[in-house]
Structures are given as C-alpha cells and as structure tokens.
Design a protein with these regions (language model features):
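Short glycine-enriched loop/turn motifs at secondary-structure junctions
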Residues: 102-105
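Rossmann-like AdoMet/SAM-dependent catalytic core
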Residues: 115-183
Length: 183
C-alpha cells in the first residue's frame, strides 16, 4: 500500500529467507541478503548488488547495530527508504531487569532507540521519519501521504485481506525461474 508492488525490495539481514519467500508468494519482487545466515527459503533470489532497490526491509535488525549511523549511511547507498521494526525504549528508560527487549539472556541487542532518536537520524540524513507503531518504522526521502499511513493502520481490522486479493503470486513464475536455472 505504501510502496508499489512493481518495485524491487531487499530484505536485509534476511535470515533463512522466509519473509522474502512469503513476499514473493503474494507478488512482491523481494530479494535476500544476509552475511551471517544461509538462505534456505528464497534460494535463487539473492540480491545482486548492481540492481536498483526501491526499499529495504530490516526486521529486528537495528538493535544489533554496533555503529547505527554508519550502518544506516551504508544502507542508504542501496535505497533511500528503510522499512524496519525495532521497539522504542520506554520513557523513562527502564532498568535492565524491567524491560524484556534488552535481551539480557542473549546479549545481542546493543542499540536502543526512541522516537526522538529516529527524528534526529532522519534530520541527519535528510529523511522523513514515520512511526507507524511503537515497533514499526519508516525512514525515507519519500513523502508518504498521511491518509496512506492511516490506511496502513487499518490492517488491524482486516484491510490487508482486501489488499491480498489484489496481488498476484510469484510462486509459479519463481518455480519456472528456479528450475530453468538448474537445467
């Protein structure tokens, strides 16, 4: 809804590739990239670094950045739109034992953000910041019309089911592409 189904998208730090596969199955041209994980579900749709990308998705990635500003700078060389999830820290900042998102059991969450943090990052890179929910965000050069943001929030009442009927799966065409490559 916010970005066209005819665009090209990259799922960064995509893990095993399940999100890429699911998005391709409903008709979006998504590609996989992850330097730490094997692509199991979207093999054949690895990102070609010479291809244009309209937007990058990053789910549960920002909190792992050791140097967020540099990471964002590098991502913006690929696309001027980042669609991502990360929980905003509560205000006041909770003690470690009082907020599950610190991830003390695994120690992998090392960067935490507030709405103000993302507003400052947006300003630094001349982007717009859209806080869709407290855990879903967009940083983009594009101006997103306020009505589109409101419609996006309607997914809570089932709007996504209507949109889903308008999409065409890439499952069959991907099967052909994959099997043709393996001949």
């Amino acid at each position: 809804l916010l970005f066209g189904k005819n665009g090209r998208y990259l799922d960064y730090a995509a893990g095993y590739g399940i999100f890429v596969r699911l998005m391709r199955d409903i008709g979006f041209d998504f590609f996989w990239d992850d330097k730490y994980t094997q692509n199991l579900f979207s093999s054949g749709f690895e990102w070609d670094q010479n291809s244009d990308i309209d937007a990058i998705t990053l789910f549960e990635v920002f909190e792992h950045f050791g140097d967020p500003i540099n990471e964002i700078k590098n991502l913006l060389k690929i696309s001027d739109t980042l669609i991502f999830s990360t929980d905003l820290h509560p205000n006041p900042l909770p003690k470690p034992k009082d907020w599950w998102y610190y991830g003390l059991d695994h120690g992998q969450h090392i960067a935490f953000y507030s709405r103000k943090t993302f507003e400052l990052i947006a300003k630094k890179f001349d982007l717009n910041y859209y806080g869709i929910t407290p855990s879903f965000h967009i940083l983009s050069k594009k101006n997103i019309a306020p009505y589109k943001l409101k419609i996006t929030r309607l997914s809570k009442i089932g709007l996504h089911k209507i949109i889903y009927t308008l999409l065409q799966s890439k499952t069959e065409s991907d099967h052909y592409l994959i099997t043709k490559k393996s001949l």
